[in-house]
Amino acid sequence: VRLCETDGAVTADNEGLTLRHGSEATIYFVNATSYNGPRNHPVTAGAPYLENAADDAWHTANTNYEQVRSAHVSDYQQYYNRVKLNLGGKLPTVTTDSLLRSQVPQLPPADGKTADGKPLPTPRGNAYLETLYFQYGRYLLISSSRTPGIPANLQGLWTPHLWSPWRSNYTMNINLEENYWPDFTTNLAEMAQPLDAFIQALAENGKHTVHHFYGIDRGWCACHNSDLWAMTNPVGENRESPMWCCWNMGGAWLVNTLWERYLFTRDRNYLRQIALPLME
């Protein structure tokens, strides 16, 4: 943690940083972990997280807020600005949360009618809100899928919990796949690269799963849930029902994203060197 760009007095001790008589300050928080890929033990073969964090913190020494913000906006907009959508919606005069409340109807009665027996009115569409949702989905993917080998998970980057629901894992019986539905269709092919690397890690572990669970000596499989370590075996919490726990088509569904990349790019080298070996 570094505190700088302040008009107050800063002191530091074992308890932390203290700012006195200041009206403003810029605080840089730098974090790192020992995660070093799914095949490496984070303790015995982990990344040098202290050195990495210290190096990142050192690079903030001669950087002010405006420079950091400018670099962020430039990096983000090179992807975001590729696609524009105009459905003819007008800029609203209310905040987004107020706009949402005005557009989302209350749950209707079971018969779909009002108290006087009349059909419930159909809510009108809002072209601005639909455009906003479209670009919001692209924003989420750009922000969540930039780390090599680590695709966007169930909660993205914004979970407020130390232990997130479903551990912020990868649910591969639709959630992980739908995270990446906007990638090629909205010109964000780079965001799929972490998913490609993750599928390759799944394929390595999936060879053991398909052999030990199903007695098959070729190919690979992945079940419904995975994590940072690219696990592929059947898992679950509490009641591990076979209805979902033993579903083993996660790998088959995920490799469809590899084929989609080829359909969009027609990159035969990618098809030959990466996609087909994982699909066969």
Q: Residue locations for each model-derived region?
A:
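Acidic/polar, glycine-enriched structural segments that form the non-catalytic walls/loops
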Residues: 1-170, 188-211
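Extracellular structured ligand-interaction cores
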Residues: 22-26, 136, 176-177, 244, ...
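Helix-terminus loop motifs that line ligand-binding clefts
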Residues: 145-174, 181-256, 262, 269-274, ...
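Residue-level recognition of tetratricopeptide repeat
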Residues: 138, 260-263
